[in-house]
């Protein structure tokens, strides 16, 4: 069976290590780095807006609503709605790209690469693919779930921070 059918919750919790928090931290750093690089493209948005969009980590439903709400103070209603639409599309594309390329990420970049590429979706939509293409065992499931939860907690904090500029 899988993780949900496992009665040994204590053993699963004991298997979590502090080192596992490095993956979400590196995912956040990499996503923000590439979002900052997007600000350098000709005709693109300011750095803070690109970082706010990148802070969604694939969480399209929450990130677009937060950007529309928090960004209205600094961007105005129209600007915030436009940026929220960009965030929605960027995060949907991230999820679809991760979902369709999980096998390539695992083959070319290692077993944990699909977890990082999936972002928040590592704990739900992409989890079956992560298990399948990262060796077929449920060994990485606790890491994928921890990764998704850590990113989910960081989304409102980072979007709130970057939308203030």
Label for each model-derived stretch:
Residues 8-39, 84-96, 143-153:
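Entry/N-cap segments of selected transmembrane alpha helices
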Residues 156-165:
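Juxtamembrane boundary at the C-terminal end of a transmembrane helix
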Residues 48-97, 109-146:
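Alpha-helical membrane segments and immediately flanking helix-loop junctions
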């Amino acid at each position: 069976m899988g993780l949900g059918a496992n009665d040994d919750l204590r053993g699963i919790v004991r298997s979590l290590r502090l080192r596992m928090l490095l993956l979400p931290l590196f995912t956040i750093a990499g996503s923000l780095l590439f979002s900052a690089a997007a600000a350098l493209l000709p005709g693109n948005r300011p750095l803070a807006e690109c970082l706010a969009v990148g802070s969604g980590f694939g969480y399209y439903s929450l990130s677009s609503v937060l950007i529309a709400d928090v960004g209205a103070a600094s961007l105005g209603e129209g600007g915030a709605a436009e940026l929220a639409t960009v965030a929605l599309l960027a995060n949907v594309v991230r999820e679809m790209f991760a979902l369709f390329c999980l096998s390539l990420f695992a083959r070319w970049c290692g077993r944990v690469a699909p977890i990082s590429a999936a972002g928040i979706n590592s704990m739900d939509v992409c989890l079956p693919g992560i298990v399948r293409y990262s060796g077929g065992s449920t060994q990485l499931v606790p890491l994928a779930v921890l990764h998704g939860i850590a990113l989910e907690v960081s989304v409102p904090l980072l979007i709130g921070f970057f939308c203030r500029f």
